[in-house]
Regions:
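Short, conserved beta-strand edge motifs with alternating hydrophobic and charged residues
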Residues: 140-143, 205
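Conserved beta-strand-loop-beta-strand hairpin that lines the nucleotide-binding pocket
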Residues: 95-101, 152-265
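Short amphipathic alpha-helical segments
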Residues: 31, 68-71, 218
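Short, charged N-terminal beta->alpha structural module
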Residues: 1-46
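Bergerat-fold GHKL ATPase/HATPase_c domain
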Residues: 50-141, 152, 156-169, 173-177
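Residues that cap or initiate secondary-structure elements
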Residues: 24-25, 110-112, 198-200, 260
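Conserved polar catalytic motif of the HATPase_c/GHKL fold
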Residues: 145, 149
Length: 265
């Protein structure tokens, strides 16, 4: 099956954003930045980010330290640099940061080798001053389910039912190794976007580059009494204020109540 990419970024989509990081000279970084609507890239952040300085996105190899650093101000997120540079970055990444949110774009391989959910959950709690408690815990559980679905069922296209039995789980592990050895599937991106849209709530969107799925049909299927496998969408639906799918089922958008630690004290 051919790869279905996240929507391409439109030219000049987000002026006022700058990419920071060491880039491969084999491709024209600044031309790719311009195509994304980014200011010319820089190898390091400005010494003194004033009011006129653009919002910063960190780019480079996906390591725990670079991702953690990218989720800490002055940065607004991380874009993993692939073999083709910035090609394939989804439009939602740029739009989210432009709107004041936080974003990440990683390949499936990298997403399987770093504690992605933990890194994102910590950053969300810190950036939104999210109060600890049940809501924060449910958010992290939903994030874990959505990320797992995006990687396994979306980008790697591994069926739900394989993990339903011990024998099936052995097959699942073998198939996963094979899919991650496939350069096309392994390079598909998972993208995570966090945005406080209105007082009292924030959205968490997880995008993949797989074939997509029918959210309503999948929720109905998992609700059956004899269902033995699924994507955990019933749990997500119960934990979220709202749940929607976009981009032909390749993006899951979850809305959560937002109570800051200050408000809850």
């Amino acid at each position: 099956m051919t790869s279905t990419a996240c929507p391409d970024v439109k030219p000049n989509a987000a002026p006022g954003l700058r990419l920071v990081g060491s880039m491969n000279r084999m491709w024209d970084v600044d031309r790719q930045c311009a195509a994304l609507g980014l200011a010319p890239h820089s190898t390091s952040p400005p010494d003194d980010a004033g009011a006129e300085e653009p919002t910063l996105l960190l780019a480079g190899p996906a390591t725990i330290e670079t991702i953690r650093h990218s989720l800490t101000p002055p940065y607004a997120g991380f874009l993993e640099i692939g073999s083709d540079g910035l090609t394939g970055i989804g439009q939602r990444c740029i739009e989210t940061v432009r709107a004041g949110g936080m974003t990440l774009s990683l390949t499936a391989t990298s997403a399987c080798t770093v504690p992605l959910v933990e890194l994102i959950a910590v950053a969300i709690r810190r950036r939104l001053a999210l109060a600890t408690g049940e809501n924060a815990e449910l958010m992290e559980i939903c994030l874990a389910e959505a990320v797992s679905n995006a990687i396994i069922h979306g980008n790697l296209e591994i069926p739900n039912h394989l993990r339903a039995t011990p024998k099936g789980f052995d097959t699942f592990r073998q198939v996963m190794r094979e899919r991650l050895s496939d350069p096309v599937m392994a390079s598909r991106r998972i993208e995570i976007h966090v945005l406080a849209r209105q007082p009292g709530s924030f959205t968490l969107a997880v995008s993949d580059q797989g074939p997509g799925f029918d959210l309503a049909a999948q929720i109905k299927k998992e609700a059956r009494a004899d269902a033995r496998s699924g994507r955990g969408l019933g749990l997500i639906r119960r934990a979220c204020a709202t749940i929607e799918s976009e981009d032909g089922g390749r993006t899951l958008v979850m809305t959560f109540p937002w109570e800051s630690a200050t408000e809850g004290s």
